[in-house]
């Protein structure tokens, strides 16, 4: 099998499974739908692992070829092609591996769904195909296709329960917010096409960069900026939408309206990593603009810290994990801004495993609670759901950066990158990611203690209480006990727990300090020496653990865990008093910094008001009633006046004739004697 065939199979097999499940779902049934989609993703996962292994043992070389030319227009070729290198191979394994776990898990989680079972499997398999096309692309056109495809499928999946108003609102919100980011992304691609050599293929664009190194572009009359800086910022606007960076992050928490498996897939391995992958892939461009990198770093720092604060007050078990995703995406963005692209991609990988684990473990707890998602109704689930308890503990330990867990190696590396960066804004970024360590540990173990320890709070609730999640989410009765989830749910948890512990230790040296990303990621070491300094400081994974004993990071994490234990295990009455004492801050967090209100009341309502103005004033009053109907009325009015002259009496016509003759005579004499 040649390389082209291999890569086509990896990309297209999930699409084939999606089409079969979607078009023939009623004929093949539920078992047929999940079998064909799982088989397709499993084939892709195995072949992706084979490709990655080839890169690791040196038997596989970088592949960059076009599959076919889609369109030729004005000397410009729009092609479909694959660029498969070490970064692509790593992402292929992450995407297909996590997707496979999600597919298997979905069999148990969606077991009781009466309708839409086949449709859901079709969607998640299509989601996998879309992400593969994005990461395997060798040109901006295919990148944009995958970019829009993951956006479309996420819209369908977030709104899977389309009869719920909250779900339809959430998927429309995600779609519209991402359109804002995509508009900037499209403008950036337009600049690349117009000024970077007239090609959209990555290798051609990168080769042309020296020709535009000092080029400027006029933004406004008398205002010129660096062409590369403007291009980088516009491309990053797209990343802000897809990877949910402040202030385009507001769609991500509401994506929890979709079923839990798709929450795991969106947050761990697909849509939210697209923007981070794109910036890393475009490292040769970004390395030419320190201004753009500073902006990226500051935005990532704001996202990491301030989204973490919002996770502290959440009571929905899935929303806690959602806000942790926002915060962790901020960490990765800080790494990008510090020119530590390899560190960002390393955290993308480790985060994918432990975040998928956390979401799926949360879903398992939700199953045990009869689909009640409110943590205030849980407690002591450790007694009833030991596998879910242990795997969520592992996920949280990795999330907060506990030594020897995967998240420790990647998260601490990001903090070190911010520390060593010399760009403007790096001081704020270092403070933000450092403070986020405490915040992350606090909300992660607040969730853990509320769910798995303490009193069994559902026993004090009314029977079949309403928790605001719809009729099917009725919760446990007073005398009911939670139950451990079936093997089809717990097996993916166990399998994801393994890389959540060991993958960081295995991968840190080759990915960050070896040559894994050689010739894939470009860093201008003279202008941005962060990685060069970190390489000198790194003496091995175990030495990194030893170094953490002298770092504030470990002690901030411990302080966060102890604070959560004190407030939610030893003194559970205290959080309510603290919230009351700091009521203004709590209300600010509860309203998510009022950004949703700003967007809804100013931008959404403002746009509708502007549209209403143009409709009523511009279209109806000026065009319809003014120009169109007004001209008709004018003709009618003139005709009505002229009609009065047509009386039918001879003396009227004679008087008109005499008047006309007098006018003509007057004009004649005026001309003669003037």
Swiss-Prot record:
It is found in: Cell membrane. It catalyses: a quinone + NADH + 5 H(+)(in) = a quinol + NAD(+) + 4 H(+)(out). The keyword Nucleus does not apply. Keywords: Cell membrane, Membrane, NAD, Quinone, Translocase, Transmembrane, Transmembrane helix, Ubiquinone. One of its GO terms (molecular function) is NADH dehydrogenase (ubiquinone) activity. It is a multi-pass membrane protein. The chain crosses the membrane at residues 4-24, 36-56, 67-87, 90-110, 115-135, 140-160, 180-200, 219-239, 259-279, 293-313, 348-368, 385-405, 425-445, 488-508, 549-569, 653-673. Pfam families: Proton_antipo_M, Proton_antipo_N. GO terms for biological process: ATP synthesis coupled electron transport; electron transport coupled proton transport. It is an enzyme of class 7 (translocase). Its main location: membrane. Its EC number is 7.1.1.-. It comes from the Bacteria. GO terms for cellular component: plasma membrane. NDH-1 shuttles electrons from NADH, via FMN and iron-sulfur (Fe-S) centers, to quinones in the respiratory chain. The immediate electron acceptor for the enzyme in this species is believed to be ubiquinone. Couples the redox reaction to proton translocation (for every two electrons transferred, four hydrogen ions are translocated across the cytoplasmic membrane), and thus conserves the redox energy in a proton gradient. PANTHER family: NADH-UBIQUINONE OXIDOREDUCTASE CHAIN 5 (PTHR42829:SF2). Belongs to the complex I subunit 5 family. This is NADH-quinone oxidoreductase subunit L. It comes from Neisseria meningitidis serogroup A / serotype 4A (strain DSM 15465 / Z2491).
């Amino acid at each position: 099998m040649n390389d082209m065939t291999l890569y086509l199979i990896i990309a297209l097999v999930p699409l084939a499974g999606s089409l079969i499940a979607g078009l023939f779902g009623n004929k093949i049934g539920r078992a047929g739908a999940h079998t064909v989609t799982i088989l397709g993703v499993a084939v892709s996962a195995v072949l992706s692992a084979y490709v990655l292994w080839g890169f690791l043992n040196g038997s596989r070389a970088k592949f960059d070829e076009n599959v076919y030319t889609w369109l030729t227009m004005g000397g410009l070729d729009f092609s479909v092609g694959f660029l498969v290198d070490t970064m692509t191979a790593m992402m292929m394994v992450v995407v297909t591996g996590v997707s496979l776990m999600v597919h298997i898990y979905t069999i148990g989680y969606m077991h009781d769904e009466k309708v839409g079972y086949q449709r859901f499997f079709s969607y998640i398999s299509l989601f996998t195909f879309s992400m593969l096309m994005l990461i395997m692309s060798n040109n901006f056109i295919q990148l944009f296709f995958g970019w829009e495809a993951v956006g479309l499928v996420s819209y369908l999946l977030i709104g899977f329960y389309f009869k719920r108003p909250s779900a339809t609102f959430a998927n429309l919100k995600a779609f519209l917010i991402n359109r804002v980011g995509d508009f900037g992304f499209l403008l950036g691609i337009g600049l690349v096409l117009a000024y970077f050599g007239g090609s959209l293929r990555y290798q051609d664009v990168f080769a042309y960069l020296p020709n535009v190194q000092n080029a400027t572009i006029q933004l406004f009359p008398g205002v010129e900026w660096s062409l590369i800086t403007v291009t980088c910022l516009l491309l990053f606007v797209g990343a802000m939408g897809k990877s949910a960076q402040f202030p385009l992050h507001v769609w991500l928490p509401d994506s929890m309206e979709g079923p839990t498996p798709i929450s795991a897939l969106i947050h761990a391995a697909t849509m939210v990593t697209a923007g981070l992958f794109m910036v890393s892939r475009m490292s040769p461009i970004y390395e030419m603009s320190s201004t753009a990198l500073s902006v990226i770093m500051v935005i990532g720092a704001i996202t990491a810290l301030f989204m973490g604060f919002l996770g502290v007050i959440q009571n929905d078990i899935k929303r806690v994990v959602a806000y942790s995703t926002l915060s962790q995406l901020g960490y990765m963005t800080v790494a990008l801004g510090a020119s530590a692209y390899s560190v960002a991609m390393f955290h993308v990988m480790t985060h994918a495993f432990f975040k998928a684990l956390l979401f799926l473990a949360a879903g398992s707890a939700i199953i045990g609670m009869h689909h009640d998602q409110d943590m205030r109704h849980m407690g002591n689930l450790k007694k009833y759901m030991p596998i879910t308890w242990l795997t969520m503990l592992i996920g949280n330990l990795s999330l907060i950066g506990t030594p020897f867990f995967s998240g420790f190696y990647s998260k601490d590396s990001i903090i070190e990158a911010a520390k060593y960066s010399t760009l403007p804004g790096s001081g704020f970024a270092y403070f933000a990611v450092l403070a986020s360590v405490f915040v992350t540990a606090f909300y992660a173990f607040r969730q853990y203690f509320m769910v798995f320890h303490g009193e069994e709070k559902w026993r004090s609730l009314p029977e079949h209480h309403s928790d605001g999640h719809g009729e099917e989410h009725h919760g446990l009765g007073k005398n009911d006990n939670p139950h451990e989830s079936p093997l089809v749910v717990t097996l993916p948890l166990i399998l994801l727990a393994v890389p959540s512990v060991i993958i960081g230790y295995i991968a840190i040296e080759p990915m960050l300090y070896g040559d894994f990303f050689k010739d894939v990621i470009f860093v201008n070491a003279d202008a941005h020496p962060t990685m060069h300094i970190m390489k000198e400081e790194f003496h091995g994974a175990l030495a990194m653990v030893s170094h953490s004993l002298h770092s504030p990071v470990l002690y901030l994490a411990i302080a966060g865990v102890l604070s959560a234990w004190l407030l939610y295990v030893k003194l559970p009455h205290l959080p309510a008093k603290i919230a009351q004492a700091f009521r203004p801050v709590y209300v600010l967090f509860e309203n998510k910094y009022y950004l949703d209100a700003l967007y809804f009341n100013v931008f959404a309502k403002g746009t509708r008001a502007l549209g209403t103005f143009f409709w009523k004033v511009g279209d109806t009053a000026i065009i319809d009633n003014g120009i169109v109907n007004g001209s008709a009325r004018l003709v009618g009015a003139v005709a009505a006046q002229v009609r009065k002259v047509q009386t039918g009496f001879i003396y009227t016509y004679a008087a008109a004739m005499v008047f006309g003759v007098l006018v003509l005579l007057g004009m004649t004499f005026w001309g003669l004697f003037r």
